[in-house]
Amino acid sequence: MQIVTDKHQKELKKHGNEAFPFLVSGERLSRYETGSFWWHWHPEIEILLLTDGPMCCSANDRTFHLKEGDVLFINANVLHTGSMENFQDCRYTSVTFDPRLLGGFPGSAVWTKYVEPVIRNFSLPTVCIDSSENWHEEFRALFRELISVAQNTPDYRELEITLRLQRLWLLLLPHLPVASGEYSRNAAEYERIRRIVAYIEQNYMEKISLKDISAHLHLCESECSRLFRRCMNVSLNVFLQEYRVERSLEYLNKREPLTEIAAKTGFSDSNYYSKVFRRVKGCSPREYRRKKS
């Protein structure tokens, strides 16, 4: 299993329906062939609660090493990915919802003052609720209540859910940084990042270079490189190598020879593949295969 996206890495899964765009689902990383879900984004806000085991989760330029009980708020339209840590499975509950459930309709006072400034703030990809601040426990308890209501309340369900979403939002808002106001510039930059990630996803098995990627975006190589590092906090080359390693895991799980895996995932040879794999995963491909078996 893997998350299905379009050519721009937008997730195609429906989160609820048009009448009530809200979804709560129990997930576990071992359901994914690679023990991870790949980079994707969606226009809905997502909040995760880890219920068992750890997870390494990255969103745009930030990486979190989450543990059981942690909650992660992922803003709308933010690229994110998650993977196992130390081969441990992770169970988590995911809540995704359309921001309109918070503000009624675009143009309203609630939407303009309290919702739009957050979802258009591209410098705010995530908030980690991990008990490091006094308000975190209240947020976590209310989020658990939301999950329970969504799963067990047949009467007035939509009203009960909306009420708790708004209470969560009211609790979260005072602790968020003020948006810079450079909405159009930031939106354009992250649209380019999504195009870069999509290009890598579609071509990682080939010999692609910075020149190829920058040409795809109609940017000069230096600007393309600076843009990616600024927005993702990693060089484009390192990101490409790490992505190729993640994609190679499904072949490792199928017991394919390392030479064939290297060829299928864009590495020049099996030795280079093994070297990069060790840097990314902390063990060789063969050691990884033994630990997974």
Language-model features and meaning:
Residues 1-71, 77-78, 86, 112-113, ...:
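Generic protein-terminus/edge-of-domain signal
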Residues 197-198, 202, 207-214, 219, ...:
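Terminal helix-turn-helix DNA-binding modules in bacterial transcription factors
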Residues 77-100, 110:
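Ligand-binding loop in jelly-roll beta-barrel domains
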Residues 169-172, 176, 200, 228, ...:
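Hydrophobic recognition helices of helix-based DNA-binding modules
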Residues 69, 223-228, 272-273, 277:
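Short hydrophobic/aromatic patch on the recognition helix
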Residues 110-164, 198:
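Amphipathic alpha-helical segments enriched in hydrophobic/aromatic residues interleaved with Lys/Arg
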